[in-house]
């Protein structure tokens, strides 16, 4: 018997443990798609980012006057003015009016909120609460304004950490400042205008929701990346103690931002960022699988296994991940959603085909192929597989559930009219003849269920007929039983009567005999008495 390798995605601990057998599962249409590292997160703290939107330009020998900076400053003021006004309206009650609501001593301008949900009011409360820290950070505006560094850490008296970020300053430092003395003022002004214009266009696009109401519209991922620019990794490294890349954290939406203050004179924006606490479980892998139909026992079927499992060491669980955030390499969850698997399911995952359960398929709209690392895994018994380069039809034997097509067998593949280019070799070096019993196939599809229901209804009708017949038989048996009981009772009574009669006759016989004996004795005594009397007379 040929030995088949087993691929364990986790870490082997015991030699007898159960591992996921990727190769065997792929042969029955259960294909591994993605493996992610499991991490847990919670929103625990906040950090502040001071975004300086107007860059510093080093003075030049020819004292160039950059008109582009003046125009950029004017346009940026028009962009930030509505945001600043909205923040002031929310954080301050309307003048001359007593109609405002207080949350734990915090005054909120109700008119600025308008019709707001509970979550939006909570965001407004958070905005007002952040004003204290924002003002403390803004008090350091002179040191922030004077710096020429792209990322600058500042601390105020309470050791509140803030990070000053100048996304456009990084571009100025690396490109513009090195050329100030080597180019004419007009060329530099045009080049600076181009850079500032592009940055301004990007800000206008991503901050459009904040122009309506910054308290009710959190900063999007695009806005955060635009604000931070190329300094995103440095900011993430300064605020988070994790080895996960900044792109993964931002794409998962774990860092949420909110504008809490705008300083128009200095062109500074203070953004409150909710910083998560991230903990990675090193030996926990979440594996996504994709199921396609397979040809088993002369019919199209699909395996019944979960689409996503969690593997820790050599143990597996079902993992729905309904409340998790997924990226390409990580899955971030607030809690563990693992669900236990049955022993049969674990054995099936380990490659024991006899423990697997399949469901039959009725209908033509079904997943019958999947692309896997540059190859194609398809059910070529349920769709037309035609290789165009070289040109030949691909046949799938009866003992193969699916067919793996790689570069060695075909370069251009057509599946029911869809053309694919094969670019990789398959890493599967063996194929197993599958033997699956009929008892492993169940019906779960709607069309199959309707068919089975009709069969069940027919069986129920037959059962009702049989029940009626059995009731009739039971009724006849019941009447016969009553008659039999009466006869038995009569026989018993007759026997008892006969026994009583015999006993009475026997008693009468004994009594008569005793009476006769007594009479005999009496007569005998009388005779003796008479004889004695006669003797006395003589």
From Swiss-Prot:
Disulfide bonds join 324-333, 348-356, 380-385, 387-410. It comes from the Viruses. Keywords: Cleavage on pair of basic residues, Coiled coil, Disulfide bond, Fusion of virus membrane with host cell membrane, Fusion of virus membrane with host membrane, Glycoprotein, Host cell membrane, Host membrane, Membrane, Signal, Transmembrane, Transmembrane helix, Viral envelope protein, Viral penetration into host cytoplasm, Virion, Virus entry into host cell. It is found in: Virion membrane; Host cell membrane. Glycans are attached at residues 56, 73, 89, 182, 352, 427, 433, 457. Residues 508-538 are cytoplasmic. The chain crosses the membrane at residues 487-507. One of its GO terms (biological process) is symbiont entry into host cell. The 2 coiled coil regions form a stable six-helix bundle. This is Fusion glycoprotein F0. It comes from Mumps virus (strain SBL-1) (MuV). The lineage of its organism: Viruses, Riboviria, Orthornavirae, Negarnaviricota, Haploviricotina.
